[in-house]
A protein has these predicted regions:
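Short hydrophobic targeting helices and cationic amphipathic motifs
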Residues: 5, 12-13, 24
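Short terminal hydrophobic/aromatic SLiMs and anchors at protein ends
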Residues: 14-15, 31
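NTP/phosphate- and nucleic-acid-binding module
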Residues: 30-442
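Residue-identity detector for glycine
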Residues: 9, 28-31
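Intrinsically disordered, low-complexity segments enriched in serine/proline and basic residues
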Residues: 2, 20-23, 30
Length: 442
């Protein structure tokens, strides 16, 4: 009987290991890395940033092992950086799904014939294309945006007023041959963007949905920790009188914004003039000037693309009408760079909890401290980055500050003498001893 129970226990032990392995595999497949021991990663931190990386966000993210620079404006995302990106994407997805957004993935390879219908394949009109010759003849471009392709796609699926409204979005890599690509991941030649497009039967319905997106964007930036991101009046170009941008106040930003005392009115430089201010009952003496980095924008496109590309629907009286459109963008990789740049201090990165790759940075010191740290790590792999390297404690502490995870937990022979762990908060630097019985890792 004893032998049987022992065999049964061994069986369940291996079943548990198999289930855990499968769970890790599934989670890893979707880009969520949950078993992260420093000793088992290829990540290495750097004391100094590469000489050609002058932007603070790029320098810190490189030093901390989040990204790797290939060339100007082109970066690889390493495991920790990818995890930050996935958390940003998850927040965006959740809020857009709430307002009826449906996720798609369009090809990056673009047919010139489609773009020539709007005049936007010409280098004189759009000078940021990456273009290439196709084997066998012809030309292709790498998409800098997707207004034309999504409009053309919807011609297959929108034919009646009953098919409207509809909203689709994607989160994918864009390519722009930028002349200035020297701001880390704030401005790249290859970058990750969320672009959403909505389609409507009437202008009233476009306005209704536009308002829903405004509210969703406010929730997104709040959750990302970018609480001083303000909806800003900008030029609507040929689409409408105004569009809206979402700049985050940032000393190294490329934009200039003007805001009143309670920031209920914010204008970009392009529309900041007496005529516009008079429309809002304001005057220049009410406003302050600051620099900012744009992390999103929204436009009422109306018929800008649906008309030349022939996107129409039959209304209730069976008359052909042109579809109204809106477009809504968020620079996902730029958001990551802005967060890195904005919250960093002289020791390194400081991630808001919602986007941090891991909430906790765990350190074990000494034989007993390391053993206890292993126990704390077990079962908490999804929220804990475990620095189990055989290096000096000071090196671990410096790397924890450089990498910027919100909470550091240190278990040492010394803290165990008090049956406690030392908990340090990255944002404030506050440290305290917490009894192990009261230490909640969640």
């Amino acid at each position: 009987m004893a032998r049987f129970l022992k065999l049964l226990g061994t069986y369940f032990y291996y079943i548990t290991l198999m289930v855990k392995s499968q769970c890790l595999s599934l989670l890893g497949r979707y880009g969520i890395i949950i078993d992260m021991r420093f000793s088992q990663t290829f990540i290495k931190t750097l004391r100094e940033a590469p000489k050609d990386e002058i932007a603070k966000n790029g320098a810190l993210l490189t030093r901390a092992g989040y990204i790797h620079k290939e060339l100007a404006g082109v970066y690889d995302y390493l495991p920790l950086g990818l995890r930050v990106l996935e958390k940003i994407k998850a927040i965006i997805r959740e809020e857009l799904n709430k307002i009826g957004g449906q996720e798609v993935m369009l090809t990056a390879l673009q047919n010139p014939e489609l773009w020539e219908k709007t005049g936007r394949f010409s280098d004189q009109q759009v000078d940021i294309w990456f273009k290439t010759e196709v084997t066998g003849g012809g030309e292709l471009g790498l998409a800098p945006t997707h207004e034309e392709p999504i409009t053309n796609l919807m011609k297959t699926y929108i034919s009646s007023y009953k098919d409207l409204p509809v909203s689709v979005y994607q989160i994918q890599t864009k390519f722009r041959n930028e002349k200035r690509a020297k701001s880390g991941i704030l401005r790249g030649r290859e970058f990750i963007m969320k672009d959403m497009y909505s389609f409507h039967a009437t202008e009233e319905d476009l306005n209704r949905y536009y308002s829903e997106v405004e509210k969703a964007y406010a929730r997104i930036y709040e959750r990302l920790g970018l609480t001083d991101t303000y909806e800003t009046f900008a030029s609507g170009g040929i689409f409408s009188k105004y569009s809206h941008e979402y700049p985050t106040l940032l000393p190294v930003g490329e934009d200039t914004v003007y805001y009143n005392a309670d920031k209920s009115l914010v204008f970009n430089k392009e529309v900041y003039n007496d005529e516009v201010l008079a429309e809002f009952g304001a005057k220049k003496s009410d406003f302050s000037e600051d620099t900012a980095a744009e992390v999103g924008n929204i436009f009422k496109l109306k018929f800008k693309y649906s008309e030349p590309l022939g996107l129409q629907f039959s209304d209730a009286e069976n008359r052909l009408q042109t579809v109204y459109m809106g477009c809504y963008g968020i620079g996902v990789s730029r958001v990551m760079g802005v967060i890195a740049e904005k919250f960093a201090d002289d020791k390194g990165l400081v991630w808001p909890e919602e986007v941090a790759p891991f909430k906790y940075y765990l350190v074990g010191i000494g034989a007993e401290g390391s053993k206890k740290a292993e126990e704390l790590y077990a079962g908490n792999e999804d929220v804990v980055f475990f620095d189990d390297r055989d290096v000096r404690p000071g090196e671990k502490f410096a790397d924890s500050e450089l990498m910027g995870m919100p909470v550091r937990i240190v278990v040492s022979d010394k803290t165990l003498a008090e049956d406690a762990a030392e908990v340090t908060f990255r944002k404030t630097g506050e440290s305290k001893l917490v009894k192990l019985s009261e230490l909640a890792i969640d």
